């Protein structure tokens, strides 16, 4: 599928399929004609699976069936000029029925209170939160071929749904490219005289594309959750924690560069955006940090740019530096033209001194700095800072201490050892707890730690979990 085809269909489906405007209809009809029904349907399945990842296969399949059917009917030669508008209106009405077979969304009921085009636009804007914990598990070669031989089309549909709903934050061209290559591999190897050898060879050839797709899904998911400014802060925190001996001038350009890449590539319909941009970023990583840190130097000996990127991405935090405590930025720092520079400097200095996961630091720093910046809009900013700074400092300190307590021992131990130490700490803290109560607390705390105490923890899930744990501190 050529880049322009993906571009046009993505735009048409993402923003306009339900609108019924002539120019949008023409785009979709052009794609149906160019791609053919089967590829058009496959691309529709990918798009709706990534848009509604919490839905069932049956719900997404039913929606795709309706969309393909109305597109075929309304794009046929001699079709009624009002066909597209009529059929999309019927689809939006059907979506509002209590037993509608389509993806379920909490916003549907509100959309159904609207009429006509307004309802269609409301429906078109609905989407689920992306999956932050991909659960797709590839079957064995034998299981793949058994399912493929039994029902090739059914296997392909199920795979497109499962993979696209789990890795839907990867740029669309990467998702299309990988899934198409995967299904081609299955078709070739399951009809081969030596399927095991075939799968081994094909997977080796697809390895870099697979890594690029899954890693792009990771970083784009984080970017989608944070937005551009918080992503920039997040990358700065991570780099400062990984290389606390570096200078701000070494790490800030890297944080900004990666943020700019994600802003360009995550929603790009260019086939090679990530493949072109990430290798250039790894050169900058090695140029800035390989001489500052032995682990980054080791990463830069990896044989491929993707290897370097993955090595640096998954690198754990280093021991924080033992440096004098730093003061919060003042009104002079935050209310002048150099406010961004002051916030970057404070974020960097706090991060290199602090051993608490990035999701904690990003959350509390965002709240702290935002509250102080609001003082700049008051009549007496100096007085506001004098009042707010001590409060923010106490909240910041309490938050970090609580985060360190929640994640204590996690990064330095295997999961089994961590759970043992956690049980010992909880037993000491609550000596009267029954074995069942203790087991429940260990399970709850260890589940939280496994998801939110690493350097690349998913922001959406962990933010809500941290809110629940830190409510008293955040509301103080």
Curated annotation (Swiss-Prot):
Disulfide bonds join 29-75, 74-83, 96-112, 111-122, 145-190, 189-198, 220-266, 265-273, 286-300, 299-311, 335-376, 375-384, 407-453, 452-462. It is found in: Secreted. Associates with membrane-bound immunoglobulin on the surface of B-lymphocytes and with IgG Fc receptor on the membranes of T-lymphocytes. Interacts with LRP2; the interaction is required for renal uptake of GC in complex with 25-hydroxyvitamin D3. CDD domains: ALBUMIN. Glycans are attached at residue 288. Involved in vitamin D transport and storage, scavenging of extracellular G-actin, enhancement of the chemotactic activity of C5 alpha for neutrophils in inflammation and macrophage activation. InterPro entries: ALB/AFP/VDB (IPR000264), Serum_albumin-like (IPR020858), Serum_albumin_CS (IPR020857), Serum_albumin_N (IPR014760), VitD-bd (IPR000213), VitD-bind_III (IPR015247). Residues 17-208, 209-394, 395-476 form the Albumin domain. Pfam families: Serum_albumin, VitD-bind_III. This is Vitamin D-binding protein. Keywords: Actin-binding, Disulfide bond, Glycoprotein, Phosphoprotein, Repeat, Secreted, Signal, Transport, Vitamin D. Belongs to the ALB/AFP/VDB family. One of its GO terms (biological process) is female pregnancy. SMART domains: ALBUMIN (SM00103). Residues 1-16 form the signal peptide. The modification Phosphoserine is found at residue 434. GO terms for cellular component: axon; cytoplasm; extracellular space; perinuclear region of cytoplasm. GO terms for molecular function: actin binding; calcidiol binding; vitamin D binding; vitamin transmembrane transporter activity. It comes from the Eukaryota. Its main location: secreted.
């Amino acid at each position: 599928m050529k880049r322009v085809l993906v571009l046009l269909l993505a735009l048409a489906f993402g923003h306009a399929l339900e609108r019924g405007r002539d120019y949008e209809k023409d785009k979709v009809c052009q794609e149906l004609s160019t791609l053919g029904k089967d590829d058009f349907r496959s691309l529709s399945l990918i798009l709706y699976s990534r848009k509604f990842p919490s839905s069932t296969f049956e719900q997404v399949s039913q929606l795709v069936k309706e969309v393909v059917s109305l597109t075929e009917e309304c794009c046929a030669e001699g079709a009624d000029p009002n066909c597209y508008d009529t059929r999309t209106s019927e689809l939006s009405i059907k979506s509002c029925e209590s037993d509608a077979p389509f993806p379920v969304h909490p916003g549907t009921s509100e959309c159904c209170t609207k009429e006509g085009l307004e309802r269609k636009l409301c429906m078109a804007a609905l989407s689920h939160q992306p999956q932050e914990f991909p659960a797709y598990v590839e079957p064995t070669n034998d299981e793949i071929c058994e399912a493929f031989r039994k029902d090739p089309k059914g296997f392909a549909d199920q795979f497109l749904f499962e993979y696209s709903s789990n890795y839907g934050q990867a740029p669309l061209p990467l998702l299309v490219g990988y899934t198409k290559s995967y299904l081609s591999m299955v078709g070739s190897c399951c009809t081969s005289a030596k399927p095991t050898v075939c799968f081994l060879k094909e997977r080796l050839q697809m390895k870099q594309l697979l890594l690029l797709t899954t890693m792009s899904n990771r970083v784009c998911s984080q970017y989608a959750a944070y937005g551009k400014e918080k992503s920039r802060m997040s990358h700065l925190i991570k780099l400062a924690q990984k290389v606390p001996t570096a200078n701000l001038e070494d790490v800030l350009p890297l944080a900004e560069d990666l943020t700019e890449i994600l802003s360009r590539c995550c929603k790009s319909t260019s086939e090679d955006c990530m493949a072109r941009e990430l290798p250039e970023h790894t050169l900058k990583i090695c140029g800035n940090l390989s001489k500052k840190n032995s682990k980054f130097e080791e990463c830069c000996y990896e044989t491929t740019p993707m290897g370097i990127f993955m090595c640096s991405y998954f690198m754990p935090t280093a021991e924080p530096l033992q440096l004098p405590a730093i003061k919060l930025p003042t009104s002079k720092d935050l209310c002048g033209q150099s406010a961004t520079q002051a916030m970057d400097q404070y974020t960097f200095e706090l991060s290199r001194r602090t051993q608490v996961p990035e999701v904690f630091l990003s959350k509390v720093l965002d709240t702290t700095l935002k509250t102080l910046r609001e003082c700049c809009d008051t009549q007496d900013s100096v007085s506001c800072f004098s009042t707010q700074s001590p409060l923010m400092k106490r909240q910041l300190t309490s938050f970090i201490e609580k985060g360190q307590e929640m994640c204590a021992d996690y990064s330095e131990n295997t999961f089994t050892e961590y759970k043992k130490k956690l049980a010992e700490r909880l037993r000491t803290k609550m000596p009267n707890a029954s074995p069942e109560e203790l087991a429940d607390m260990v399970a709850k705390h260890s589940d939280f730690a496994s998801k939110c105490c690493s350097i690349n923890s998913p922001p959406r899930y962990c933010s809500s979990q941290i809110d629940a744990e830190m409510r008293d501190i955040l509301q103080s």
